Amino acid sequence: MRFLSLAPDRPRRGGPRHLPSGSPAPPPPPPLLLLLLLGGCLGVSGAAKGSRRPNVVLVLADDQDEVLGGMTPLKKTKALIGEMGMTFSSAYVPSALCCPSRASILTGKYPHNHHVVNNTLEGNCSSKSWQKIQEPNTFPAILRSMCGYQTFFAGKYLNEYGAPDAGGLGHVPLGWSYWYALEKNSKYYNYTLSINGKARKHGENYSVDYLTDVLANVSLDFLDYKSNSEPFFMMISTPAPHSPWTAAPQYQNAFQNVFAPRNKNFNIHGTNKHWLIRQAKTPMTNSSIQFLDNAFRERWQTLLSVDDLVEKLVKRLEFNGELNNTYIFYTSDNGYHTGQFSLPIDKRQLYEFDIKVPLLVRGPGIKPNQTSKMLVANIDLGPTILDIAGYGLNKTQMDGMSFLPILRGASNLTWRSDVLVEYQGEGRNVTDPTCPSLSPGVSQCFPDCVCEDAYNNTYACVRTMSELWNLQYCEFDDQEVFVEVYNLTADPHQLNNIAKSIDPELLGKMNYRLMMLQSCSGPTCRTPRVFDPGYRFDPRLMFSNHGSVRTRRFSKHLL
């Protein structure tokens, strides 16, 4: 029995080289009549009568930034997706860490609603609670059960997927017809995959084991051997450019003259910022700079294989006659930094370089060479894809909004001006033996004992964007109740925290606005503009010359 059944109306071009045999065939999608009785997908608006619903492909990179030029190596991806469709210049994640962000993509929810707060089982990352409560309601599960889509997953799922305490590799999340998932975190060699619930180990032979290429090959085989009677959804989650930054052999000498960008916030002290940022050592040591330059270069090298993957997918879709009826999304789970505010390498922070991601989309009804400045977040991916499939967002409890009208060029569109960013810091209860001078409660202290995280690196922000304003307001849940506010129109590199130069009364209103977002759920998160109907926020008041005033203490609101 084959992993993927051969469609009866397509000639076979040789047996699948990369898909294993011996796995049980998935059940067929529900018949159309049953879907209609269940109130399923009724067809995407604007589709030709009698035409099949569109296919969707989502390619998800791991730790790929937008601010520091993360899309530069992906020339083919930009040409085949961005230039053939729409590029979003204001795409954000609600949490700058892998597992919470990926959970937001799958559920369409903010972290305070899906309750995945970090990359551990204790933090609800692929835990039994996640499996029981959230997985049945992910957008792929809805596509499968309510819309009759074939659903295919390949690559990194969640950081703790495959943990023995949460079902191991035998656990296949609800909603996936074909499951080809990596055990735990990103690797390029010497990893284990769950193939429809059965473990398969890979070694370190480039020709058969390099994970990005394996994902490309199994995805191409799916396109050749799937059923042609139903639409499909594919999610391909690459390891690149996540550490350990192992490039394919043919790309290991690329970008030899490339270094981490020396932008205005590179290797400077984080003045007037949260203590975790202030503890970074400025200037960085030469060894730290050399380390992050090498990391930056190697990250780009790994992305060249992702570029090849995208090219292969597009060409195969075109060869199979399916490209014109397929939406292709390209994005990342979070951004990254390399030396900004003297933090060597990581994500997790509230600044643009960590929370802003690439987002490119092509598909039916999207004009080529479009750029949108509309404020979108990865919680919008699920609602948008369900909208494409014809499933109403109001049937879900998702926090995000469908940006399909933006893709189709809708005019006079009422849209949000704010998204929420929230993060719960991680620390260690013991002192790091490599950094004995540091107290317990910190983590990710490398190199030179510069820490990237701590228990009280717990914060929530409102990111505000409109035609006139470009703002960020953040609160930390710590003893200081520290506040950071940035006017990104005047200060795009977030050098100047203006929290102490703003009227305390206005800060109080902004605090209340943040708490409204942190307590939202489902439809109340989708309300455009200001979330408190009794309050009209005027950003112009922020930049009046109030002088230096003492900021009031805010009421804390935990994630």
Curated annotation (Swiss-Prot):
Which reactions is this enzyme annotated as catalysing? Hydrolysis of the 6-sulfate groups of the N-acetyl-D-glucosamine 6-sulfate units of heparan sulfate and keratan sulfate
Tell me how the protein is altered or processed after translation: Processed by internal peptidase.
- Output the PROSITE patterns linked to this UniProt entry: SULFATASE_1 (PS00523), SULFATASE_2 (PS00149)
Protein known as: N-acetylglucosamine-6-sulfatase
Sorted alphabetically, which PANTHER family does this protein's record hold?
A: N-ACETYLGLUCOSAMINE-6-SULFATASE, N-ACETYLGLUCOSAMINE-6-SULFATASE FAMILY MEMBER
Report the family membership.
Answer: Belongs to the sulfatase family.
Q: Which residues are glycosylated?
A: N118, N124, N190, N205, N217, N286, N324, N369, N394, N412, N429, N456, N487
**Region of interest (Disordered), ranges:** 1-26
Q: Which residues carry this modification: 3-oxoalanine (Cys)?
A: C98
Which positions are annotated as binding Ca(2+)? D62, D63, C98, D333, N334
Query: What keywords would UniProt list here?
Result: Calcium, Glycoprotein, Hydrolase, Lysosome, Metal-binding, Mucopolysaccharidosis, Phosphoprotein, Signal
Q: Which organism is this entry from?
A: Capra hircus
As recorded in UniProt, coiled-coil segments are: none
